[in-house]
Regions:
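Gram-negative outer-membrane beta-barrel transporters
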Residues: 43-44, 140-149, 167-202
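Residues that define the transmembrane beta-barrel architecture of outer-membrane proteins
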Residues: 25-31, 67-71, 119-123, 137, ...
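Outer-membrane beta-barrel proteins
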Residues: 1, 19-25, 36-38, 61-65, ...
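Short coil turns and loop connectors of transmembrane beta-barrels in diderm outer membranes
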Residues: 2, 42-43, 83-85, 121, ...
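Outer-membrane beta-barrel "beta-signal"
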Residues: 76, 124-128, 180
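Surface-exposed extracellular loop regions of Gram-negative outer-membrane beta-barrel proteins
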Residues: 2-19, 25-61, 65-124, 145-167, ...
């Protein structure tokens, strides 16, 4: 079979209480729905995913932050370059939606109910090599280049000398390269020794 499909649904309830007189007891209902389609043919694999995020905010003693809804698509492609070796080239695009946390929205003096969600568009191009030198020893190396375009990034800034607050800062561009290696030695079926290293430049 070349096609595979998956659907998942997650629900979460969060609330915040404190002993402060200014506490309005905010709470949030979160609904996340994900639909994934995967297509495989010989050495080629493609995955498409659509995430629907719903954040319903309210307060027991006031007006909560704005409700948030977002459709976030993502796509990834992988191709095995050599039939007899695990050498893959990868490319991906992902839209990431991050709602403000309770601390960023409601924390005493620091929070802001007017925060917009943080939206990131992530582009990635990479290569992966895996090799088994014996039935006990495995090796994996990856190299990735990425670009992240962030809109309405949430950051903490000083409101005065003693108080900080959270704001959206418009657009942020992040570019970089990641390299990693992982070596594993299997002592037996239950015990493995691993050595890993990672380097990031941006």
């Amino acid at each position: 079979e070349h096609w595979a499909f998956d659907y998942s649904l997650d629900y979460a309830y969060n609330n915040l209480n404190s002993s402060l007189a200014t506490d309005t007891r905010p709470y949030r209902n979160t609904i996340l729905q994900s639909f994934t389609a995967k297509y495989s043919l010989s050495r080629f694999t493609a995955v498409a995913r659509l995430l629907h995020s719903v954040y319903l905010n309210d307060e027991k003693e006031g007006e909560g932050s704005k409700n948030m809804r977002r459709l976030s698509p993502s796509f990834s492609l992988s191709y095995k370059l050599l039939q007899s070796h695990d050498l893959f080239i990868r490319a991906s695009y992902k839209s990431i939606f991050r709602a403000p946390t309770f601390t960023e929205s409601y924390y005493y003096l620091y929070g802001s109910r007017d925060l917009k969600p943080e939206i990131t568009k992530q582009f990635n191009l990479g290569i992966t090599w895996r090799q088994s030198f014996s039935h006990r020893m495995d090796f994996e190396a990856t190299l990735d280049a990425y670009i992240n375009n962030v809109k309405d990034k949430i950051v903490a800034v000083p409101y005065n000398m003693f108080v900080w607050t959270h704001i959206n800062v418009g657009k942020v561009l992040v570019q970089g390269v990641d390299a990693s290696i992982l070596t594993s030695y299997h002592l037996n079926s239950r015990q493995t020794i691993s050595l890993s290293g990672n380097y990031t430049y941006n």
